[in-house]
Regions:
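Glycine-rich beta-strand-centered segment in the early N-terminal region that forms part
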Residues: 22-37, 50-100, 114-115
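Residue-level detector of alpha-helix initiation sites
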Residues: 140, 151, 187-189, 289-290
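Glycine-centered, small-residue-biased loops immediately flanking beta-strands
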Residues: 206, 303-304
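Glycine-rich Rossmann-fold phosphate-binding loop(s) that bind the pyrophosphate
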Residues: 77, 149, 184-187
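Rossmann-fold NAD(P)-binding glycine/threonine-rich loop
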Residues: 290-293, 297, 309-329
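NAD(P)H dinucleotide-binding glycine-rich loop of Rossmann-like/cofactor-binding domains
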Residues: 57, 95-178
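C-terminal hydrophobic helical "lid"/dimerization subdomain
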Residues: 164, 252-255, 264-271, 277, ...
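Adenosine-nucleotide cofactor-binding segment
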Residues: 177-178, 183-186, 194, 198-291
Length: 459
């Protein structure tokens, strides 16, 4: 199977090349990708190259593919898997294969025929053996790509835990009908977290408070969930969850003001031995020491802080109130990615329409723009970047479609479609793009790329 793929040769050195992939053979699967969404972890891997723990040391001579938030269509199925997958079936992929002895060798870093920024991938048998190729029954490919970042949030909701006073029995997950705070929560992952908090078929809070320090981000987030932002805040209800968006930038005492949201119904508000107004569950989306300390002060009795932000500083330190750890049962957790169940549930919930991951997307482009868009992650503000792997298209902000549409009817039509959908990407926009954008042409392959073989028998 011929493919055009971005391949990583070193730090900030990726090349768009035509290659030949293996056929499915007896036990492989070949998938034609349709979409990939770019993750901040892609930026870390591409920027660091072999300096990243997950990237092999020999990529200069044996390059890997990058990108891991994918969706596509099965094109070839080996005899071993014909009872489980069929040609033409839509699928997603769990990138954390979790192969014993090879735990750090995840999709998007360590594999030569599996990545996101490519037209096709070859999946060796181990991918299916680990349960990481997942059927998808949704209506749009881009939603399946977003199942991977959504699964990280689902994992976060399941990583939090609580226990009753004087009890060793732990209740895993957020507090059902509790109070939740998202600090710096209007980025792409924060928006996904809001969606899950309001629409998850599992536990949901009764009250959700979302902070940021940028009015534009807050206004966009509020609009996506049907609220009008003005005067530094927006208040409303989403699917039975009380939701508040608030700008903390000008607050003289953010801890006091954020606790005020809970004082209306906090049974511990007048208890001098407790922290009245504190939150049951806090998710922090920025690795900033001052915010970590604020979160410490904002936890309620038995509260759980999920340090969701992945830091780059290996020596990150912050003040944390350990008096309250001892007496008020405060605790901290973190998670990096989800497992197969988190991913399978995310794919299922998106396919059934429970979740609306389109709120995360701010930019759309083609395969030709994928590498530059990855390198520009920290330079250009916005949420998720969506790549259609079989088209050529500059990475473009949805909010810029109208301006580009003045000279290009292609963007004018995309603007019309998205404007009719609250400014969000949607299935109609995807269908139009796939039918009208310039197609990627795959040339003569420079080499046949074979994947290394890892078997479960070697565990």
């Amino acid at each position: 199977m011929k493919a055009k793929a971005w391949r990583l040769y070193g730090a900030r050195d990726a090349r768009l090349e035509d290659v030949e992939l293996e056929s499915a053979g007896d036990d492989g699967v070949v998938v034609e990708l349709v979409t990939n969404t770019i993750c901040l972890s892609d930026y870390k891997g591409v920027s660091l190259g072999t300096g990243h723990k997950r990237v092999p040391k020999d990529i200069a001579t044996r390059p890997t593919m990058f990108g891991h938030e994918v969706s596509g269509i099965v094109r070839e199925v080996g005899e071993k898997w014909k009872g489980q997958f069929q040609v033409g079936q839509r699928v997603g992929l769990q990138p954390s294969l979790n192969i014993p002895g090879h735990e750090l060798e995840t999709v998007g870093y360590a594999w030569h025929t599996i990545g996101g920024e490519t037209t096709h991938v070859y999946l060796p048998s181990i991918v299916r053996e680990m349960g990481c190729l997942l059927p998808y029954d949704g209506d749009a490919f881009f939603k399946c790509s977003l199942a991977e970042p959504i699964s990280c949030i689902v994992s976060g909701f399941r990583t939090n835990y609580h226990n009753a006073f004087c009890s060793h029995d732990l209740e895993v997950g957020i507090v059902d009908k509790g109070t939740m705070l998202l600090m710096a929560g209007c980025g792409a992952m924060g928006l996904g977290c809001i969606d899950i908090a309001c629409h998850s078929p599992e536990k949901r809070p009764r009250r959700l408070v979302v902070t940021d320090i940028d009015d534009a981000r807050l206004a966009r987030a509020a609009k996506m969930f049907g609220m009008a932002y003005a005067g530094g805040r927006a208040d409303g209800e989403v699917n039975g969850v009380e939701v508040h968006f608030v700008n903390t930038k000008g607050m003289s005492d953010p801890v006091k003001e954020l606790k005020a949201y809970n004082l209306v119904d906090d049974a511990r508000a007048d208890n001098p031995t407790s922290t009245g107004g504190g939150y049951d569950d806090i998710f922090l989306f920025a690795a900033i020491p001052a915010l970590i300390t604020q979160c410490s002060d904002l936890l309620g009795f038995g509260g759980c802080l999920n340090f969701f932000a992945g830091p780059t500083d290996q020596h990150l330190m912050a003040n944390f109130n350990f008096y309250n750890v001892h007496y008020l049962m405060h605790h901290v957790v973190a998670n990096s990615g989800g497992d197969v169940k988190d991913m399978a549930d995310s794919v299922d919930w998106i396919g059934k329409g429970y979740l609306h991951p389109e709120v995360m997307i701010t930019h759309v482009g083609g395969l030709d723009s994928a590498f530059e868009a990855t390198l520009d992650m920290l330079k250009i503000p916005g949420g998720k970047r969506l790549v259609y792997t079989h088209v050529n298209m500059p990475m473009t902000a949805i909010e810029d479609f109208a301006e580009k549409g003045k000279a290009d009817p292609f963007f004018a039509e995309l603007d019309r479609i998205c404007s009719a959908n609250k400014g969000l990407w949607c299935k109609e926009a995807e269908d139009y793009l796939l039918a009208n954008a310039p197609r990627v042409e795959i040339g003569e392959p420079k080499e046949l790329v074979r994947e290394r073989r890892i078997t479960t028998a070697a565990r």
